[in-house]
């Protein structure tokens, strides 16, 4: 509607943006009754225009195809009576925000703004609350630093969680895990079969466990052993237990549970739980 006005620098485009934005905000706030009245659903497709001089207008779209400037949302009047007024105004505000950006970056593209120009223009625009934020009362946004910190923390947390299953996949154990000799005797052969089905769940649980001595997580090529007293897992190297030595330990006790003597146990068999290296 005002194609003759062509700002050519970042500052001029931003000034154009602010003027159009001010007009649209006025239409949806201070002049809302007049704006509501002009958007008659009985009329043809209507658009809300904002101008650099901070005025606004409800009018038909430009006749030329394609138009000289990007056009705002078409037919905003048709939805007026089919929605709550607050929701309708919010919908118009969202479309107006999109239109303002399209006009600003149309000028940027037309007059050859480079990467730094576009970045600076967007930064200047982004410092202002959107029309939707003004109309909906959400213009008091959180400080950018707080949002960036929250987003960074969330992304970091998601990245860590998604990578954990790949980093902690345990190797298949050569035999089903054995809880202890007493429970096996009570459960009998049937319980051993059921235990085989639960082994995968135990591996998954231990894949998230940290070493009770050094606090590090499980590595796929490391030998681990579990204390049958406190149920904590340890790197074999941290408690000085090798796979060969573990084969001769019936019930393993970590250094804390065995009084600090380096851990161990008596007898033969395979009652302890261990992860192969």
Swiss-Prot record:
Keyword list, A-Z: Chromatin regulator, Metal-binding, Nucleus, Transcription, Transcription regulation, Zinc, Zinc-finger
Residue spans, zinc finger PHD-type: 208-260
Cellular component, GO, one term: nucleus
Site, as annotated: Histone H3K4me3 binding: 218, 224, 228, 233
Family the UniProt entry places it in: Belongs to the Alfin family.
Domain notes: The PHD-type zinc finger mediates the binding to H3K4me3.
Name of this protein: PHD finger protein ALFIN-LIKE 9
Native species: Oryza sativa subsp. indica (Rice)
């Amino acid at each position: 509607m005002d194609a003759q006005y062509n700002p050519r620098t970042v500052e001029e485009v931003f000034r154009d943006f602010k003027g159009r934005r001010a007009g649209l905000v006025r239409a949806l706030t201070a002049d809302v009754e007049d704006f509501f009245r002009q958007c008659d659903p009985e009329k043809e497709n209507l658009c809300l225009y904002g101008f650099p001089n901070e005025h606004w207008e409800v009018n038909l779209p430009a006749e030329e195809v394609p138009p000289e400037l990007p056009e705002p949302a078409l037919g905003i009047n048709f939805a007026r009576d089919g929605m709550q007024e607050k929701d309708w105004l919010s919908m118009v505000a969202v479309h107006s925000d999109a239109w303002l950006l399209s006009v600003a970056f149309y000028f940027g593209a037309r007059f050859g703004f480079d990467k730094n120009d576009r970045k600076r223009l967007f930064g200047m625009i982004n410092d202002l609350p959107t029309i939707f934020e003004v109309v909906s009362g959400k213009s008091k946004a959180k400080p950018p630093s707080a949002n960036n910190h929250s987003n960074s923390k969330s992304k970091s947390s998601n990245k860590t969680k998604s990578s954990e299953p790949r980093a902690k996949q345990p190797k298949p154990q050569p035999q089903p895990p054995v809880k202890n000799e007493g429970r096996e005797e009570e459960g009998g052969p049937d319980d051993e079969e059921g235990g085989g089905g639960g082994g995968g769940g135990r591996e998954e649980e231990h894949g998230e466990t940290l070493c009770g001595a050094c606090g590090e997580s499980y590595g796929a090529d490391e030998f681990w052993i579990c204390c049958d007293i406190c149920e904590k897992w340890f790197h074999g190297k941290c408690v000085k237990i090798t796979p060969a030595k573990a084969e001769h330990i019936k019930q393993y006790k970590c250094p804390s549970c065995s009084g600090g003597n380096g851990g161990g146990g008596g007898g033969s068999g395979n009652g302890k739980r261990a992860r192969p290296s």
